């Protein structure tokens, strides 16, 4: 029986309320199904930790991440007014901790399943199922290289992409497409590269590398789309897509559009992979005004726990771990289909604890 070492890193804001709920979902899946063991290590980092200690993260965190199989993390950054007056305002610490947990430890590829769970209502007309997968380049692109202001009348940012990072990005997209069942429309396995090719040299370079990579995946089609057209088609006809691949900033935008049509930020999970320790986290931010008030949505954290177990289980060829992820997902869907508790952001009136407990009870009822 395999044992998995998982770092639990709530970081800032509402993460301290909801990330332990995701950890509890994983532990409950283990208790119900067996077949795998979990060793959970709770650690601290982020803006609030910096305000209290003067350090961005606890001593030994890099070493703990190096020994871990994955981490379940919250969001970094806290923009409380009083905190902004301190020596550690959110914009100074939040961004570095986020970048450290991504490119700082080599997690240069972002994954976001855009899946509409059963029981959730899609805002798109006549759409009741969505299953698209977004792969985003995290280690390069517009967000990575520091820009600067030029005098009082101009500013400059730099967009740089390299062959090595782009090959890793493309390889991840094609590998995921090969492992999926294809697009819902007709089962064809495909990668759609969305950017502004023909306008920006870096994006033409993306086309070149993706075309080269596609030769090693004859079973996966490669398509190109201008990102504005891609956004339109994602809203009109999401079934035409299987795997979508985008540059960092473009992927950020497309990912949030995808979150909107699959239940919102309070539902969607995301992951950063490829480095020392893969990071799994809810798509939402720190939401500081909800901290400790028992009205934050716990479902994204629970969904993220399911994604962690499924992804690591797939990488390690461990069906027991993947079954744990499936159990959590089925329990989420059971709650939604049976009109169970929903938090205010979903149109309900239930609190964080009651919503989470409903899913935990459902885990005891559903079968795989």
Q: Where are these predicted regions, by residue range?
A:
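Internal helix-turn-beta structural module
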Residues: 314-368
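N-terminal beta-loop-helix "entrance" segment that forms/cooperates
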Residues: 35-59
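Active-site rim loops that border cofactor/substrate pockets in soluble metabolic enzymes
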Residues: 42-50, 203-244, 248-253, 280
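Glycine-rich phosphate/nucleotide-binding loop
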Residues: 49, 234-338
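N-terminal glycine-rich phosphate/adenylate-binding segment common to multiple enzyme folds
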Residues: 50-159, 249
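Buried hydrophobic positions in well-ordered alpha/beta secondary-structure cores of metabolic enzymes
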Residues: 12-15, 69, 135, 173, ...
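Glycine-rich phosphate/diphosphate-binding loop of Rossmann-like nucleotide-binding domains
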Residues: 7-24, 28-33, 151-228
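Short, glycine-/small-residue-rich phosphate/pyrophosphate-handling segment
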Residues: 114-145, 160, 165, 285-322
